[in-house]
Amino acid sequence: MATTRFMARKSTLASLIAMSLMLSPAFAEEAESEEAAEKGYAELIADLAAQEGLFNFYRNTDSGETMLSLREEQLNTPFIYHAQTMDGVVEAGHFRGNFRDTRLIEFRRHFNRIEVVTWNPRFVFDENNPLSRAAEANRSEAVLAVLDIEADDNGRVLLKADPLFKSQALHRIAPWANPNQSGPRFSLGQLSADRSRIARERVYDNNMDVVVDYVFLNEEPVVFGSAAIADPRSITISLQHSFIEMPDNDYQPRRDDPRVGYFTQEFDQMTNPEWAPWGDVINRWNLVKQDPNAALSEPVEPIVWWIENTTPHEWRDAIRQGVEDWNIAFEAAGFKNALVVKVQPDDADWDAGDVNYNVLRWTSSPRPPFGGYGPSLANPMTGELISSNIMLEFVFMSNRWTLGELFSSGAALGDYHNFDDAHMYCSHGHEVQMGHMLGRLASDQRMYDDIENDPILVQALRHLIMHEVGHTLGLNHNMKSHGLWDNEQVHDAALTQGVIAGSVMDYNPVNIAPVGKAQGDYYSYKPGPYDLWAIEYGYSPALDDADAEEARLQQILSRSHERELAFGNDADDMRAPGRHIDPRIMTGAMSSDPVAYAIDRWDLVNHEFGELLDKGREDGQSHQRVLTSANMLFGQYAGQATVVSRYIGGVYVERAYVGQTNDVRPYTPVPRDTQRQAMQALNNYVFAADTLESMQPVLAYMQQQRRGFNHWGNNEDPRPHQMILNMQRNVFNHILHENVLQRLSDTAMYGNEYSLTDMLGDLTGGVFNGTHTTVSQNLQIEYVNRLIGIAGLEGGSGYDNLSQAAAVGQLRRIRNMSAPRRAGDSVSNHYGYLHLLIDRAFEA
C-alpha cells in the first residue's frame, strides 16, 4: 500500500516536472521551433500579409511579427545595404534624411542558419598574382547577425525578421562613446526591443526598405536634451534599412585624381608596386548619351529631381532654377538636359525617403542641424551613384538665431562646422542664413512677403540649392575658389554675372559691397569655371581605347594649376586653429585679396553698428532684432579676423604634377609682405584699443525678448569685454599655435622671410600700441599669459625650443615697459599686474 502511494506520488511528480519543462520558455521555444519546422514554408506564410519583390516580406496582421524570405541563389551574393534616419533627435546625431551608412552585406548559409556578413572591399588583389591566394590574410569580416532558418523548400529560405530589424545588428543607432569628450553627455539609454516596432516596409523588384521605430529607455537621464524631446526617459529614432540589388549595367568607373574634388570609393591595390598604389574611383551618376556621336546629346536616363510637395509654392521656381543651372556645366561634358526637375504630386503614393527617388525636401526643425544637406548613396564597388536627397531647413529663410548661445552672452567662437561625418556634412546653409541677414540689414530691407521681390533671398536660395546639388553629383567642397576676382571686380555684377567665385562649392560670405560702392552679385548662383571643369572630368563619356582615354583625362587634368580652377576641400581648409597650411583654402574668404576684402567687411560692420538703432528698432516691437543683428554683425567681424589670421605662417600648396607647368613647386611660404599686411590688419582692427568701439552705443539695447522663465539663472546683460576677448583669443589660438610658430621657423629653410622673431615682435607692438582702454588691458593680460605658457615658465610646454626662446624675449620686452607718466590708477595697476605675472613666471 505504501509502495503504491509512493509510486503514485512519483508519477505525479514526474508529470509536474514534465509540465513545468513544457511551460518553460526554453522548452516552449524549442517545441515551437520543431512545430514550425514540421509545418513547412507554405503553411508558415499561409495567413501572413505578403509583399513580394527583391526579398519577400511577410507580416502577421494580428501580432505584427514579420518574416523574410530569400531565394537560394541570393545567398552568398553581395547586396548594397543603406541606413537612413527617417526622424530622430539631433542630440543623438539623428535627423530626417540623414544618410548614415552604406556597406556591402551577404546572407550566407551555415547549416541550419543564415549569417548576415559585411566586409571591407577596399583591398584589391590581381587575380594573376600568386599573392591573391593570401587575399584574406589578417582581415576580419563582421558577422552582424545570425538567423535560424524557419523553413527551406522550393528554392527559398524563410527567416524571422524581427530579430534582425528590432536590434542594432545592421546599424548602430545609439552614438558611439567619444573618449575625447569630457563631462556629461546626452545618452539614449538602452534599446527596448519590446517597445520598438517595424513601422512599415516597401518591397520592389530591385530593392526593399524597412522602416523601424527604435525606442530607447533611460530611466535616469543626466542630460535631458532640447524641447524637441518630450521625455528623455523614452526616445524614438525612426530608421530605414534599405537593401539594394547590385546594379547590372555597363557602368564604367572613373579613377580619382588629387587635382579635382570628388567623393570616392577607396581601393588599395595590394599587388601594385607603384609609389601610390591606389585604385580609387569617383562617385558619379551613370549618364550615357542617347547619341554617342553627337557633341551634345540628351542622356538615356537623366538625373531626375523631385521637389517635395511640402515646399512652399513661391519658392519652387528658384529651387528649380538652382537645379537646372547645373545643366550649364554638363554641357561642357557633352550632355544636354542632364538634370530634370519634377514636382511631387500632392497625392503621390511614394515616400520621399524611397531610394528610387531623388528628392529636395524641406523641414522646419525645433533644433535645425543645418541649412542644407546633400548626401548621396553610391555603389561601394564602383562609385556609381544610386540615390540622393537634399534636406533644406526653413530656418535658412528666417531671422532666427541658429548658432547656439549668443556671442553677447559670452559664447566662445568655436568651430561649429565640425561634425562626426565631416566629409558628408555641410554647414553652408548656416553661413548663407547669416549672410542673408547681413544683406537685408545693409540694404535696409525687411522680410518680403513675395520671394520674387527679395533679390538677396532669390540668389541665396539658388546658390544653396546649387551647392547641395553639387554634393549629390559627387563634388567635394572647394574652399579655394574664392580667388576668381580681385577685390574690385568681385563687386561688378556686369563682370561676374552670377559667378563671384570659381565654384558654387565654396563657403563664400555674402558679397556685400563696401560702404559707398555699388552693389554687385550677392552670391554665386551659376556654375563657375571650376564646376564646368570638374563636371567635364567626371562625366564626359570615355573613349573605348584605354590608352587614349587615359591621355584624354590627363589633358583635362593638366589645367589644374590655372587660377580659376583652384581646388582645396575640407581636408585642406584652415577653419580650425593650427590645422592645415594654405590660407587660400579657407571658409569665409572672398576675392584674390582676402585681407583687403576683410578690411572692407570690418568697415562695413562698423558702419552698420552705427546705423543699427535706426534700422533695427520698430514701434511696437521688442529689441530682439537689435540683439540678433548685433550678434550677426559681431560674427561677421570675428569671421574675417579668422580669415586674415591664417596668412601668418601660411604655406601655399600646389598639387599640379611634375612637368605640368614650367615650375611645379608644391610648397611656397606666404610672401613676407602678405604676412606683414595680415598682421597689420589684425593690429588695426582686432588688437586695437578701440576695436568694435562702434558697438558701444548699441549695447544698452541688446535685449533678448523675454519668454516665460527661460532666462532664469542667467544674467541677461551683454558682455562686450568677453565678446571682444573671445574674438582675440580665437585669433591667438591660431597665430600662437605650436604648429604655426614652428612652421615660421621651418619654412625659413625653404623661402619664408617673415621670421618667428619678426612675427612676435609685430604682434607685441600691436597688442601694446600705447593707447589704454579696458579692451586693450584685457587683451594684454591674455597675451602675457599666452607667452608664459609658450615659454613653459610655469610648467611643461609643447612648443619647440625656438618658440620658447622667442616667447621669453617678448616677455622681457614687455617687462621693460611701464605706465606712462601721469597715468591713472587703472593703468598703473594694470602694468603692476603685468610685471607681477612676468616676475612670478621667471621666478618659477
Regions picked out by a protein language model, each given a short descriptive name:
Residues 452, 456, 481-844:
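Conserved catalytic/binding loops enriched for acidic/polar residues
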Residues 29-311, 329, 333, 344-452, ...:
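Auxiliary tRNA-acceptor-end handling modules of aminoacyl-tRNA synthetases
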Residues 61, 73, 98, 276, ...:
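Soluble non-cytosolic domains of exported or imported proteins
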Residues 14-22:
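Bacterial N-terminal signal peptides
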Residues 343-363, 369, 459-514:
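The catalytic-center signature of Zn2+-dependent metalloproteases
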Residues 1-8:
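N-terminal secretory signal peptides that target proteins for export/translocation
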Residues 24-28:
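Sec/Tat signal peptide C-region and signal peptidase I cleavage site
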Residues 324-335, 365, 470-471, 475, ...:
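Sec-exported extracytoplasmic/periplasmic mature domains
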